[in-house]
Amino acid sequence: MTTYLEFIQQNEERDGVRFSWNVWPSSRLEATRMVVPVAALFTPLKERPDLPPIQYEPVLCSRTTCRAVLNPLCQVDYRAKLWACNFCYQRNQFPPSYAGISELNQPAELLPQFSSIEYVVLRGPQMPLIFLYVVDTCMEDEDLQALKESMQMSLSLLPPTALVGLITFGRMVQVHELGCEGISKSYVFRGTKDLSAKQLQEMLGLSKVPLTQATRGPQVQQPPPSNRFLQPVQKIDMNLTDLLGELQRDPWPVPQGKRPLRSSGVALSIAVGLLECTFPNTGARIMMFIGGPATQGPGMVVGDELKTPIRSWHDIDKDNAKYVKKGTKHFEALANRAATTGHVIDIYACALDQTGLLEMKCCPNLTGGYMVMGDSFNTSLFKQTFQRVFTKDMHGQFKMGFGGTLEIKTSREIKISGAIGPCVSLNSKGPCVSENEIGTGGTCQWKICGLSPTTTLAIYFEVVNQHNAPIPQGGRGAIQFVTQYQHSSGQRRIRVTTIARNWADAQTQIQNIAASFDQEAAAILMARLAIYRAETEEGPDVLRWLDRQLIRLCQKFGEYHKDDPSSFRFSETFSLYPQFMFHLRRSSFLQVFNNSPDESSYYRHHFMRQDLTQSLIMIQPILYAYSFSGPPEPVLLDSSSILADRILLMDTFFQILIYHGETIAQWRKSGYQDMPEYENFRHLLQAPVDDAQEILHSRFPMPRYIDTEHGGSQARFLLSKVNPSQTHNNMYAWGQESGAPILTDDVSLQVFMDHLKKLAVSSAA
């Protein structure tokens, strides 16, 4: 008999799905009392090396309001060649190509191990991938030089048929013609005036022919012809490499005490318009590189006077940030236009000060693009991260999908409340759409323009079955996820995942439901909900909401005697959940103090798209200890783990930190590691460095690497994350002998848990 933990892990590996509850309450009323909604973390392109795509198209249910895909949950009559849809119970005839099927000769999509299956759509033209580079030239020469080298490197990684384009900007915006032999030719636009797609089309003389051809369908086998601004790599590789090499810093003089005039808003608008006119609904990536904030034209985020700093959270709270609303509105409009045509927007921002990610965040957030933040383009952090964008799978194809749509079908007892993640609504109202919206709701279809193997959406459901309509014994609720996307090879593909879970009556079988709780998935699903709310609500209100939900969950599933906090017990399936909430409350996702608006936007962007494992690390970092007393071991994220004779390695997802305890740091300063008789000390120092390198080499985006020691200024990164079980207030308590006191007034996990138990068992609650 598999345990729930094994069941959860198998489902994640096979289908890329993690549910908050793996047995569902059978009525609407009982489901609302569960506190945590029935919800799933779904990774549409979860890597499955053992799942080769099938070279035929899926069989669909014939009922027009259903159109579910044939799957292992359907009942099949092999003699009559009929199958019954498990969602609407419609009986369907198999197509003629299935004439040879039998119990012994089943098609792959009916086998239980293929609850997830990928089909290749063979009709229609194969489209080339498109990469449009949009480059800020208002930066220091060494930064620009490093960026040019990174872009030249990326050209060598693109498939020869990929189309590329180049737009550069500073005070003006230049759209470069790439078809010219021997001469550099570009169209120059003022950086203060926005242009519509129609105006751009007329000014650049873009033909409308490709647009109409591309949408006409299967009879046009040729891909739309390239134009002067977007050319195949194989044709202009040398020209573009030279052109990038010749790029100069923006020539306009910058007076003393002023910022350079930077037209990021117009440059991105022209990039979106160019692709809109020429290649709608084709996989395309706008890669925007910025070295500072937009200081003129639509989308500007700060004036050009250096004495006026860019907005802080304090300015925004006090309504003292005059460009935020207007700038955000401009970029939101561009993000929605790009999402409508299926194009991805990446933003690579490298500067010591803020660059305006707060206003621009919707561009990558709504289109599934990447957001990368660094100090300079001339750092390994940017160079390595950018190189990883072009990582290939074992078949030599990019690990990226384009122009995706996700459609969800549900059995009649359950409806879809909404999704939170890098997607936009396709406003497809169907019978399985709930009226209660969570996140992006009111639809059963979403557009995900950019997909990677780790892109993960949080999907929230509502049980709608009435209390007085019991579900038959052994009944199961089913959900089907249908993801259509353009593979990086140019093929259209459809990945179908169909899952089912048992129903249980919450009044008589509450133990079954409680035992099926996935506390890790639930923590991430509730965290996404909290961060989604934090975008529009006051910080303290979100924390209060999170606390209320946690108290209610403890009251519902804890075991206790009324008004006796010491009697409170949580079963193993719930025991880690309060700890996750404690760390979430203290995290940079909900606490903006000490973070700039750009940093908060960056952290939230990554949390809203990463898979469960990475998201858990972001909420509760992992801490490993290295010492002479044994092999490396995971230790509690607690101040008591900081010992003088230990080295700690902390992984927060965004940072990899190595901390040397006081004694170790003194030995290192004395140079013991260089003496042959202390070789074991040299090995001890090297062990965490080797482990850190392993993480640094594989993660996207590459984390910041910090090497620090007891008393070092960067030790603050560790001290701010650990649970402050010892502080300056209790460090002299009797019997206290280990660990480092933290100078903070934050409550510790122990105090948090004591308060939680007190509130959960209170009869006044």
From Swiss-Prot:
A GO cellular component entry from the record: ER to Golgi transport vesicle membrane
Expression by tissue: Ubiquitously expressed.
Gelsolin-like repeat locations: 632-718
Result after altering residue 672 to K: Decreased interaction with MIA3
N-acetylthreonine modification, residue list: 2
Positions contributing to Zn(2+) binding: 61, 66, 85, 88
InterPro entries for the chain: ADF-H/Gelsolin-like_dom_sf, Gelsolin-like_dom, Gelsolin-like_dom_sf, Sec23, Sec23/24_helical_dom, Sec23/24_helical_dom_sf, Sec23/24_trunk_dom, Sec23_24_beta_S
Molecular-function GO term, any one: zinc ion binding
Main location group: membrane
Topology relative to the membrane: Peripheral membrane protein
Pfam families, per database record: Gelsolin, Sec23_BS, Sec23_helical, Sec23_trunk, zf-Sec23_Sec24
Disease tied to this protein: Craniolenticulosutural dysplasia: Autosomal recessive syndrome characterized by late-closing fontanels, sutural cataracts, facial dysmorphisms and skeletal defects.
Subunit composition and interactions: COPII is composed of at least five proteins: the Sec23/24 complex, the Sec13/31 complex and Sar1. Interacts with SEC23IP. Interacts with HTR4. Interacts with SEC16A. Interacts with SLC6A4. Interacts (as part of the Sec23/24 complex) with SEC22B; recruits SEC22B into COPII-coated vesicles and allows the transport of this cargo from the endoplasmic reticulum to the Golgi. Interacts (via Gelsolin-like repeat) with MIA2 and MIA3; specifically involved in the transport of large cargos like the collagen COL7A1. Interacts with DDHD1. Interacts with TMEM39A.
The family this protein is said to belong to: Belongs to the SEC23/SEC24 family. SEC23 subfamily.
UniProt remark on domains: The Gelsolin-like repeat mediates interaction with proteins containing PPP motifs that include MIA2, MIA3 but also SEC31A. These interactions are probably competitive.
Protein name: Protein transport protein Sec23A
